[in-house]
């Protein structure tokens, strides 16, 4: 009986703490333009071909023929008729694509309006690396986070 009473007091106190926390803490406001998802994960390898084969054979990541990367296909939650992709790629350890970052990885984030996001980031003092590049996949730009990691921002064309 005593155990039940202690558990009830603890549960009531915990519940009240959540209620109080919910009433006193504001969720941080989100910026107008923001990341909408992960567009890709890229990392360096000493032997990219062998590593890609390992991931394909052991974990089932289907590597695109001749491209050297894998694609994960999914549907948008708000509109299930719209498909999206997340790219998985292995780069040679000598690649300069991740520069100026010294990190052996780079994450690509999907965005809705790249130009507006870059304006917002520049206004906030974020280091923007170079100009916007556009190709058949969409628009790309790069920023550097406070720890020096290069981040790729991607506004995909429809169907990506």
Regions of interest found by a model, annotated:
Residues 2-3, 18-46, 65-67, 86, 93-160, ...:
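Vicinal oxygen chelate
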Residues 7-16:
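Bacterial N-terminal signal peptides
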Residues 32-36, 42-88, 123, 141:
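Core segments of cupin and vicinal oxygen chelate
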Residues 78-80, 96-99, 132:
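Short secondary-structure boundary/capping segments
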Residues 92-94, 155-156:
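Acetyl-CoA-dependent GNAT
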